[in-house]
Amino acid sequence: MMDISELLDGLNDKQRERVAAPLGNHLVLAGAGSGKTRVLTHRIAWLIAVENISEGSIMAVTFTNKAAAEMRHRIQSTLAKHAQHQLFGMWIGTFHSIAHRLLRAHHLDVGLPQDFQILDSEDQLRLIKRLLKLHNFDEKAFPPKQACWYINNKKDEGLRPNDIEDFNDRQEREWIKIYQIYQDTCDRAGLVDFAELLIRVYELFEKKPLILQRYQQRFQHILVDEFQDTNKIQYKWIKILAGKTGQVMIVGDDDQSIYGWRGAQIENIQKFLKDFKAETIRLEQNYRSTANILNSANELIANNSDRLGKNLWTEGEKGDPVGIYSAFNELDEAKFVASQIQDWVEHGGKLDDCAVLYRSNSQSRVIEEALIRCQIPYRIYGGMRFFERQEIKDALAYLRLINNRQDDAAFERVINTPTRGIGDRTLDILRNLTRERQITLWQAVQVATQENMLAGRASTALLRFQELINSLQLDTAEMPLFAQTDFVIKHSGLYEMYQQEKGEKGEVRIENLEELVTATREFIKPDNAEEMTELTAFLTHASLEAGEEQASPHQSCVEMMTLHSAKGLEFPRVFMVGVEEGLFPSFRSFEEPGRLEEERRLAYVGITRAKKKLTISYAESRRLYAKEERHLPSRFIAELPRECIQEIRLRGTVTRAMNLAKVGSLSNTSAVENEWKMGQKVKHEKFGFGTVINVEGSENNTRLQIAFQAQGIKWLIAHLAKLEKVR
């Protein structure tokens, strides 16, 4: 038997308590940086080495294959002195990989062929496009990507077509029909998409009690990481597998539940406590961040309701205050970030210490350009650079073709974007013509139509496309570059196509197209481009930007990423940019308290990525879709503890004292003389709970600017508003 002390060495009291807990159901509420992975792996090692649980009785579920591989490695390292423990019988994997393993073993029981194929997301979209066309569905009314989202969403909820209520809604009936057609096709062809893996296993357990009983008897100990990210079918899956006798330990953090938009249900943690009568323990000691960073995160997240509650703390240093920088605009903000990174390196830091976090991908462009100007290498983590993104390349291809009809690459990119019913056979005819007659694709259209080489429908579609390009050029000839770009995006059909993409992905694409218009408005033609038109100069600029190589995986560089991508990572030096009302939190969240709370959790995740130094910035004005808009600092800044933050003022710049006063970090004469203070929590009988973010005037002329949790920002006259102070 293994020496118990070896399993508990290096753990704090709370971690030891959970690793060595009696058998049963447990919730480990693990704060950011609290060592949850270590607790999980040591718990599994404890079960094997101390409780003498067979490896084959344990199932450990993670959310990524990388996390599963790391968990297996850590457990094996912990048990290294015991050669007999090779974890051969233990199942460690993601929900999808474990479901796949079960379906392979029981393919006959679920009506699948032995060699069934997994459909990835691209294969699924391609199949749905074909089926919509085959069954004469209008792709404008039923966009293929929205059909993918609908089907996957229903499967994640555990619903088959005949389970869905149509509420006498004709459109819903059509969506159900598409789901049914798609599923029938997959079943006939032996195809299984990712969402199908989970629902099919759940149905296997429901319909085959003997198979369920076999796995319930085998997997007596189930451990699940990142439980706050589980969706409905995953929760049902764990519940049915555990049965009445299985013992389940889940590790999660309700304060880091940030994937509601893709089906994750934060309430699953609460349901687990109720359904499994689980004991809760909190891991609150943080091994990552300084006290100032942690106290800022704690104060921020305390504004959310229905939390299970925890308070992060550290035995480490207090650290620097959280820096708050008020930029004049997004260009000033980007320049500031680049200069701060240079300063960090000059004082002994490394580039790969630094991360720039933003709410939306569209925000990356101005930061990228500032880093390029300063010759600071960077990498877009988990994504592509701005000018490499699909929707940007689509829009630029239209502009390139308008600018130059000889551009065959641009022609091929947009000829069927949006779809025009021009098939591969038609394109092959055009390509052959370009080879045989040494002409461009644009010219090949003229030849093919004049010589009747094409079917009437294809010929009509190609001529209409040429008419579109010609009219776009004619209509925009006298427009400034930004207006031309805006017009082309709108009238080419790109904007409408991406608008129909359901969910966050479509919204991000639209934001990126809007940012492209902003980029054209800000573009200044260089002195060495006098002979070029403004459009040609911009297209050259975009090509050069896209051609800049990202830093190699082994090169020290700044990491840039969305806040969602940052989850699970940590960096000594973190910049959170664009922390403004309407951007972060987003305007969309103002109408839904639940969505606003998820935005706050996202801010909490961002703050807790920082180990040593955190800077939060906002721009007083920002160009969005080529329009300059005034912005207020985010309510999230107002919710930070004043003793933990500090305004950043740069030498030689105009003071921004009044800007930061809006978020309550500096005193304001009228506020001092007044009973109302920035940062004061209040309750209004109509608008609900909020935070005072600005105070103007005095006595009966006092006006308060309040960021309400559910109603957004409003100005109220203090003595008429009937506000209740909340402590």
Swiss-Prot record:
Catalytic reaction(s) noted: Couples ATP hydrolysis with the unwinding of duplex DNA by translocating in the 3'-5' direction; ATP + H2O = ADP + phosphate + H(+)
Gene3D superfamilies registered for this protein in UniProt: 1.10.10.160, P-loop containing nucleotide triphosphate hydrolases (3.40.50.300), PCRA, domain 4 (1.10.486.10)
Listed GO biological process terms: DNA replication; recombinational repair
Pfam families, A to Z: PcrA_UvrD_tudor, UvrD-helicase, UvrD_C
Domain UvrD-like helicase C-terminal: 291-568
Reported function: A 3'-5' DNA helicase, probably has DNA-dependent ATPase activity. Translocates on ssDNA with 3'-5' polarity. A mutB1 mutation is UV sensitive and subject to spontaneous hypermutability upon UV irradiation. May process damage occurring in non-replicating regions of DNA to produce recombinational intermediates for sister strand recombinational exchange.
Matching PANTHER family: ATP-DEPENDENT DNA HELICASE SRS2, UVRD / RECB / PCRA DNA HELICASE FAMILY MEMBER
Name this polypeptide is given: DNA helicase II
Source organism per UniProt: Haemophilus influenzae (strain ATCC 51907 / DSM 11121 / KW20 / Rd)
